Amino acid sequence: MIDLNKISKVVVVFIVLLTFLVLMMQSQEVKVAGLLIQFENETTEPEVTAILENYDIPVNYTIDYNSNIGRGVYYVKVDEDKINELRKNENLISEIELKKGNYNIIILSEEFVPDENFLTILEKNNLQLKKVVVCYIHFGDGPADWVVGKNCILERDAIRIKNELETNEKVLIVGLDDIEG
């Protein structure tokens, strides 16, 4: 005869072990405490708030608008037919080049100092050197005890949000603020 009480105990032990295993695996996954987002010049704080509200961010967050984390980062928005002319400048130290719609965006390194030659090329091609608006999105609203779903999210969720945000024409780049350990 089958002892249902014994089977119930085995099932309970199995569920407890499985739960423990899932929690251990989750604690070993990379967690993200926030996002560093570079927006186009003149993106306002209300626009940043509206943009973020359109994405499924699974925790509360605060916005550090125009954060001093990325001070002095500039970019140039260039039509495809003018990009080669701009690349001829030897002093152009681009950190990142990306394609947004019909434009190429050249994000310049923080060390870049525009010289007279560079400014002449910009003027000749009717281009403008613009400063990015850097915002830090801090997940959660409590102490930094790194609880997934409270004040951090899993890396896979952060990557999904990053990829979705980067399709927005006002967003230039999104970086993840990973938590060590």
From Swiss-Prot:
InterPro entries, per database record: UPF0228
Superkingdom of origin: Archaea
Matching Pfam families: UPF0228
Similarity annotation: Belongs to the UPF0228 family.
Protein name as it appears in the record: UPF0228 protein MA_3117
